[in-house]
Amino acid sequence: YATSSHFSWTDATEFRKFCQDAGIPCKPLPVEEYFQPGLCDGAFLTEEYTYDAHILRDYLMEEIAKYPGIKLHFGRKITEIEKQTDCYEVTALHEGKQEAYRAPFVLNATYASVNQILRKVKGAETQDFGLKYELCEIILCKASDKIRNIGFTVMDGPFFSIMPFGKTGYHSLTSVTFTPHKTSYDATPQFPCVGENGNCCQGGFLGNCNDCPGRPESAWEYMSTLARKYMREEYAFSYEKSLFSMKPILKASEIDDSRPTVIRALSEDPVFISVLSGKINTVYDLDPFLD
């Protein structure tokens, strides 16, 4: 981690105190070994945990396989959810055919589609999550040997981070300023590209931005220029590909940049729970509801 000499909300002294107070390992490093002269007032070696989404997915699939009663249905578009006396009936479309599922427990964990799903519920009073939406880009880079096993984050302001991306062998490059391409403050995601002919988001359903012809042009030029402005030349990296995603953010989190897990119970008998988790390490807040 490094604190920028300009336009940062935090300086080196404050960052070191934060780490000490939180019990986070934080070793001061010579700034000039990693960053261009005069741009950072402190650099620190810290320890940060990450995860590989594919490994996590495979683990969960293995756990699910232990329960023969669980069936997974992919590629369904939910059109209606109706509350019955003892269950919810979920109607969905699959390959042009209508399907219906009935269950006494419904968990709405659809991330950026959470409000879209809530608006399909009938027979129960719903409330939208107070969200804004960002159409974001994470750039995957090939990193030189010099940077292969380490990551850089410059803070605390309009800066950047480049760090190992799970076990893919790539580094992810993100920027506070350039990672979000577009922002929507509507209750459900509303962007100029939504509903355009051939685009993936149609009729109240979110698509996959990576497969969409209407996805934005990459901000690689801007992000890489910002990172190279700060980093020494020997810490080289090159563009490999971009990942685009719709990111929901609680409007209440704009003040402190918090990423809580928010859980709302729509009804208890039958059960309908909606969950929006801002970061994977806060998802454990859901355990009491599942128990």
PLM regions with names:
Residues G166-Y170, F178-K247:
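Flavin-binding catalytic cores
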Residues I81-Q84, M163-F165, R264-L266:
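Short beta-strand micro-motifs enriched in acidic
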Residues K27-L29, K71-H73, S238-E240:
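General small-molecule cofactor/ligand-binding pocket signal
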Residues S161, Y170-T174:
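A conserved active-site cap/scaffold subdomain adjacent to cofactor or substrate pockets
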Residues K97-M155, F165-Y170, K182, C193:
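Central helical "cap/lid" subdomain
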Residues Y1-E32:
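Dinucleotide-binding Rossmann-like beta1-alpha1 core, especially the glycine-rich loop
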Residues A43-F105, A109-R119, V283-D291:
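Helical element adjacent to the flavin cofactor pocket in flavoenzyme catalytic cores
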Residues E47, I55, E221-D291:
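C-terminal catalytic lobe of FAD-dependent flavoproteins
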